[in-house]
Amino acid sequence: MVVKAVCVINGDAKGTVFFEQESSETPVKVSGEVCGLAKCLHGFHVHEFGDNTNGCMSSGPHFNPHGKEHGAPVDENRHLGDLGNIEATGDCPTKVSITDSKITLFGADSIIGRTVVVHADADDLGKGGHELSKSTGNAGARIGCGVIGIAKV
C-alpha cells in the first residue's frame, strides 16, 4: 500500500516537499522545491514534534527515537531525521531529491505529524568537530519549517 505525505514549508525559506513510500520495506522518496535560500548547502532534517506554535523552534530536536548520534544519511549511527543537505544554487527554486532507507511513513517511527526544518547553514554530518556536530550537525538557524501531513494517494 503506497503512502504519500506532504509538507508546506514556511518562514524565510518557503516551499513544498512530498514524501512517497511504496511499502514499509522500501525507501522513502523525498521530492520538492524550496525558495528563499542563500547559495550554499542547507541542513535538511525531520524534527521530533509537529508543533510550529513558536515558529520552527517548537519542533524540538531532530527525530531520534533510537537515541543515536547525529550523522550523515548513509551512516548507520544517525538520527532518523538526519536527511543531510540540500544545495541551493542561488536560483529559486532549489530542488529537493532524496531517497532514504531509514525514515518511514509507516508504524511507530513514522515521520508523519513531525516537522521538516530547513537550516541556514550546511549540516557537517556529525563530522565537523564542533560542539554541536554530534547533536545538530552545526547547521545553524531554522529558516523554514512545516508539519508533514498525510496526502491523498
Swiss-Prot record:
Cofactor, free-text remark: Binds 1 copper ion per subunit. Binds 1 zinc ion per subunit.
Gene3D superfamilies: Superoxide dismutase, copper/zinc binding domain (2.60.40.200)
Entry superkingdom: Eukaryota
Known catalytic reactions: 2 superoxide + 2 H(+) = H2O2 + O2
Localization of this protein: Cytoplasm
This protein's GO CC annotations: peroxisome
The EC number(s) this enzyme carries: 1.15.1.1
One of the GO BP terms on file: regulation of synaptic plasticity
Covalent S-S links between cysteines: 56-145
Keyword flag Transit peptide: no
Residues that bind Zn(2+): 62, 70, 79, 82
Keyword tags: Antioxidant, Copper, Cytoplasm, Disulfide bond, Metal-binding, Oxidoreductase, Zinc
Residues that bind Cu cation: 45, 47, 62, 119
Pfam families listed in its UniProt record: Sod_Cu (PF00080)
UniProt cross-references to InterPro entries, sorted A to Z: SOD-like_Cu/Zn_dom_sf (IPR036423), SOD_Cu/Zn_/chaperone (IPR024134), SOD_Cu/Zn_BS (IPR018152), SOD_Cu_Zn_dom (IPR001424)
Cofactor(s) listed in the protein's UniProt record: Cu cation; Zn(2+)
Top-level EC class as recorded in UniProt: oxidoreductase
Family designation: Belongs to the Cu-Zn superoxide dismutase family.
Assembly mode: Homodimer.
Cited function: Destroys radicals which are normally produced within the cells and which are toxic to biological systems.
Protein known as: Superoxide dismutase [Cu-Zn]
